[in-house]
Amino acid sequence: DALKKNYPLGLLSEKIIKEITPSIFKDIEVYFSAILSKQGMQEGKNYLSLQIAQKLTKDFLKLEQRLINEATANNKQISLVRKEVDLEYYLFVDGLNFKLSGKADRIDFEGDTLRIIDYKTGKVEGNEVAFTEYDELISNNKKAKAFQLLMYAYLYLKMNPQYQKKEVVAGNFAFKNLKSG
């Protein structure tokens, strides 16, 4: 929630990330103190949980700065288009109406590439989001994250047909293994 609240829509820059960082960390402390007593945040597992949340957030912001710098080096910019996007599309099959829905955490552009991003608080391994056959998405429970990303991309493009000719990338920012890409 601290990221969602503080991240501005529009072009992202290293300067913007540096400017919003103190507010993000302040909000993390506010969220924790709302759940825990002030004294409870100073020791034990509550203290460790707060420290872990701050470390994961710091790592994410470092990654974001690195990605912004890499994009800039390639004459591209990252522009945040939407946050917490409700996705919904009705599919009619054999006279039946099926509602497909989801919620993407972030929609942005890196240059001309539309990126549909889902944040994960845990780990995401590469083999969980990669697939070679569409059947894997249905038959292999370990491909649920890949299915989710594919569904989000499908829903977003159905709701926003103006982007259907764009290059689209769907992926996760997994906070526990950001360094693996």
What are these regions (language model features)?
Residues 26-33, 114-131, 174, 180-181:
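Active-site-adjacent bridging/hinge elements
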